[in-house]
Structure formats: structure tokens, C-alpha cells
């Protein structure tokens, strides 16, 4: 697994705003947007591209276009704040969604949504989640992607803990991780220390979803057959974490409104 820690004064300044407990929700979202753009910039440095010929208002010129833009996969709910800036940098990118809450007693991941293309072989994927703490939710997400054939996976996070990096390395040894910081570890509540708190709460307010809420039902059989006949069509369903997924979860997440 390749881990890249962004070393840049602008990234460090935005990370400081995110860490500061005095930062309000609007300031937190703005700093997260800026830092996400920096992460996407670094993560796409070696993106495949092709040369094209264009015309300026003055003359012919050579240009560049991306080949096979990645699928963006935010982990709900905190990852939602990274989608807009990622799409601003990669306007051709499509977006899938994975929803994972956490049980506040056990810190185990509680999956409730997987809206992803059925086939991801040969397609690069960028997973967006501000916090990589225990790695339980990320391992679940990586498992969903791997079962759909994804092999080119990049994880973008603002802050990572060694425990989360270890979980990613165990689940997807060939994945790449781009982060603004690797902190020292987790506390007893499975939060990153020093971290930045609960990234979902700090963007959107307190999370009212609890792990006791029932999982979303499977789609009706007829709809499932229709989706299976259409390659690349997204399916939205609740999926359980794989048996190899770590059992802890760093923060809460909420289902979309």
C-alpha cells in the first residue's frame, strides 16, 4: 500500500482550521472543500491522459484530456462534503455512494447503503472520507468495490490513524492513500487523537440516525433482475460487511435525507 501525506503550507493551514474546535460548520465545510481539492490534485497527478488538437481564438494548439476518469465514492455522511470539490476538479467523474453508520456501544460499522455500478473492472475509483480511524467502514467500502471488480482504488482522507491505514493495507494491499496527516492513534471512543472530532457532525450538525434503525430492504426481485440485465447500472441496497472487515468504526454517519 502506498501512503502519501500532503506536505504543503496551504494544506497545513486548512487542516488547522478543521482541527480547531472554534471553527463553525460553515468554516469547516469551506476548509474541507479547499483541502479536498488539494488531495484530488495530488491523487490525480499520474492520471492517464491523451493528447488532443484544439483551436484557440488565434491558432491551432495541442491540448490534454483525461482518459477513463475515476468513479467518486463518498462514504456517507461525512464524505458528502468532499464530493463537490472533487467533481469540480474532475467534472467528467461519476459518483457512487456507500452509507455506513456506527454502533456507539461497540464502534462496529453498520452498513445501510451501497449505490454503485455493478461492474468496476478496469475503472479507477476514488473513495472520499475525511476520517480514516479504525478502518472498519473503509474496509467495508473497499470490499464492496473489490467484489465489483475494482482494482485501481485511491483513498482520500483528511486525517488518518495508524489503525485505519493498517486496515486498508490488509483489505486492499494495492490501494493508494492520500491524506493531510497521520495522527498518533485512537482514544477509547475510537476517535482519532488529536484528530478533528466527528467530521459529519461538524459539517451538518448532530447525527440523529442510530444503529438501532432497521437496514434498508433489498430491492424487489423484479427490479434486481432488471438491473442485472443492464451492465453498469447502479444498484442501491444494504450490504453487510465482509468477515475480514475490522470491527471498529471511527465516527457516525447518517442516511441521506
UniProtKB/Swiss-Prot annotation:
Enzyme Commission identifier(s): 2.4.2.9
Pathway: Pyrimidine metabolism; UMP biosynthesis via salvage pathway; UMP from uracil: step 1/1
GO molecular function terms listed in the Swiss-Prot or TrEMBL record: GTP binding; magnesium ion binding; uracil phosphoribosyltransferase activity
Entry's cofactor comment: Binds 1 Mg(2+) ion per subunit. The magnesium is bound as Mg-PRPP.
Residues that hold 5-phospho-alpha-D-ribose 1-diphosphate according to the record: 77, 102, 129-137, 198
Cofactors named for this entry: Mg(2+)
A Pfam family that the UniProt record links to this protein: UPRTase
Catalysis performed (reactions): UMP + diphosphate = 5-phospho-alpha-D-ribose 1-diphosphate + uracil
Source species, domain of life: Bacteria
Alphabetized Gene3D superfamilies for the sequence: 3.40.50.2020
Protein's GO biological process: UMP salvage; uracil salvage
Binding-site positions, uracil: 192, 197-199
InterPro entries: PRibTrfase_dom, PRTase-like, Upp_B, UPRTase/APRTase, Ura_phspho_trans
Low complexity bias locations: 211-230, 238-248
Regulation: Allosterically activated by GTP.
Disordered, as annotated region: 203-257
Keyword terms of this UniProt record: Allosteric enzyme, Glycosyltransferase, GTP-binding, Magnesium, Nucleotide-binding, Transferase
Annotated function: Catalyzes the conversion of uracil and 5-phospho-alpha-D-ribose 1-diphosphate (PRPP) to UMP and diphosphate.
Family: Belongs to the UPRTase family.
PANTHER family tied to this protein: ADENINE PHOSPHORIBOSYLTRANSFERASE, URACIL PHOSPHORIBOSYLTRANSFERASE, CHLOROPLASTIC
Classification via HAMAP family: Upp_B (MF_01218_B)
Protein name in the entry: Uracil phosphoribosyltransferase
Organism (species): Mycolicibacterium paratuberculosis (strain ATCC BAA-968 / K-10)
Record lineage: Bacteria, Bacillati, Actinomycetota, Actinomycetes, Mycobacteriales
